[in-house]
Amino acid sequence: MQIHAGPASRRGRRGPLARLSGPEATCNSRPAARGRQRAAAPRMPAPERPRSRRPQSQPGPGELCVKPRKIVFADELRPREPLHPEKHPRDLGPRLNPVPDYELKYPPVTNRRDRSRYAAVFQDQYGEFSELQREVGATQAKLQQLEALLLSLPPPRSQKEARMAAHVRREFEKKRVDPGFLDKQARCNYLKGKLRHLKAQIRKFDDQQDSNSEDSVYF
């Protein structure tokens, strides 16, 4: 005996997908994308370009980098030696005690004429030396007084005493490094040495003449 299913039973056998309607049914009923259905064709590997060999010391294009410049001052540079240095006479080096010019200009006296010339120079410059000696001596005495005053000052207990001590110290330093005073002092020392040298040369000549006269025999 065959049983034929009616329309109602056929509708009841439809699965849950058949019951969907509206947008969900439309989305689910879309066929798969064409690209997904076909398998992706394998790509052939690109042929590698032959790498050109370069020397090890030559950097590649990606290895180039700009190095920061080093700043060097002129006083840091070492003097370059000349390719053909000139020959100079033997350098004796700086002398610790240079010979004054008057010792070379006024050698030992050998005759009466030289003695008279040395004595004239001595008398001419002795007046200048005496005047400079007085001026330099007065300034040195003033400096000694200021220095003694600075050493005797107690520690300042007020701003007034501090200003007074600072004023005395400024006066002392001003007089001590005064260019005029330093020039006079140098000139005075130079003349003192020159006059002493002239006097010694004249005395040596006179002593030699006296000894010669004593040894002489007169008939």
Curated annotation (Swiss-Prot):
Coiled-coil ranges from the UniProt annotation: none
Segments of this protein annotated with the region Disordered: 1-110
SUPFAM superfamilies, alphabetized: occludin/ELL-like
Stored PROSITE patterns: OCEL
Transmembrane domains' residue ranges: none
Gene3D superfamilies: 6.10.140.340
InterPro entries linked: ELL/occludin, Occludin_ELL
Residue ranges, compositional bias (Low complexity): 17-43
Domain OCEL: 100-210
Bias-annotated ranges (Basic and acidic residues): 72-93
Record-stated family: Belongs to the ELL/occludin family.
Alphabetized PANTHER family for the sequence: OCCLUDIN AND RNA POLYMERASE II ELONGATION FACTOR ELL, OCCLUDIN_ELL DOMAIN-CONTAINING PROTEIN 1
Protein name: Occludin/ELL domain-containing protein 1
Organism encoding this protein: Mus musculus (Mouse)
Gene expressing this chain: Ocel1
